[in-house]
Amino acid sequence: MAATLRELRGRIRSAGSIKKITKAQELIATSRIARAQARLESARPYADQITQMLTTLAADAALDHPLLVEHPQPKRAGVLVVSSDRGLCGAYNANVFRRSEELFSLLRDEGKQPVLYVVGRKALAYYTFRNWDIAQSWTGFSEQPKYENAAEIASTLVDAFMLGAGEGEDQQTNNEQSVDELHIVFTEFKSMLSQSTEARRMAPMVVEYVEETGPRTLYSFEPDATTLFESLLPRYLTTRVYAAMLESAASELASRQRAMKSATDNADDLIKALTLMANRERQAQITQEISEIVGGANALADAR
């Protein structure tokens, strides 16, 4: 019985130590998520406006750019998977990987070979363990991505897409490095309690032609539409990648805050249950000791 009591007290101490760690992680995530949300909210208007500008340019001008033209027989599709660098964030990464696998299956059904690009150590470890060929990876900034990180990633993706569009000097030589489509898998932040894993195509761009109810607005482009489009295009793709990483960063912190709060609450419940069991064991031990003392006293009295 004493051994059981010592074991219960040891488990209570262990649960208390774990609770301190999870509580600290919860507080850290809570303090960081406000900054992540602020960065996300400040970036969204710019991303929306540049998307609207490029859509207007493409819809109002006869542009023939590789990023607007569908490949006649797409064979390779680049997929950028945005994950986290650290764990302890619930099902955040598992949901990203599940959505990625769904996209890979869809691409294969369409006769396209997925070409994998990853952001975050978790995705790098996940796909390396499964012997995936990773075209390129970026790590170390999942919680606090910078615009420079997004620019580097977007540049790599655009270079691969341009090779697939026949912009390279030797298309046959560069075939293994080229892609005909660009997709991104990330986690969209909706609120502290709601995030959804999304898979979206970045290139070729999908131009939406919207019918105007009133008189049609005529635009005059200075410089010409093609020059303006090519000037804005790198910023557009970088902004798309940057916005996705900001969404994922806020989602990661929200998932970690929820996961750590749940772990802290579970530790509290476990400590209460173990404390109750320990008290019962202690009470039983005391009762047994009293019974032994009374029994010994009665035996001495009978002996007299």
Swiss-Prot record:
Keyword Membrane: yes
Signal peptide: none
Compartment(s) of residence: Cell membrane
GO MF term list: ATP binding; proton-transporting ATP synthase activity, rotational mechanism
Membrane topology: Peripheral membrane protein
Entry similarity comment: Belongs to the ATPase gamma chain family.
Biological-process GO terms, alphabetical: proton motive force-driven plasma membrane ATP synthesis
Protein name listed in UniProt: ATP synthase gamma chain
Gene Ontology CC annotations of this record: plasma membrane; proton-transporting ATP synthase complex
HAMAP family per the UniProt record, alphabetical: ATP_synth_gamma_bact (MF_00815)
Organism: Mycobacterium marinum (strain ATCC BAA-535 / M)
Functional note: Produces ATP from ADP in the presence of a proton gradient across the membrane. The gamma chain is believed to be important in regulating ATPase activity and the flow of protons through the CF(0) complex.
Record key words, sorted: ATP synthesis, Cell membrane, CF(1), Hydrogen ion transport, Ion transport, Membrane, Transport
Quaternary structure note: F-type ATPases have 2 components, CF(1) - the catalytic core - and CF(0) - the membrane proton channel. CF(1) has five subunits: alpha(3), beta(3), gamma(1), delta(1), epsilon(1). CF(0) has three main subunits: a, b and c.
Gene: atpG
Major location category of this protein: membrane
InterPro entries noted in UniProt: ATP_synth_F1_ATPase_gsu, ATP_synth_F1_gsu, ATP_synth_F1_gsu_CS
Pfam families from the UniProt entry: ATP-synt
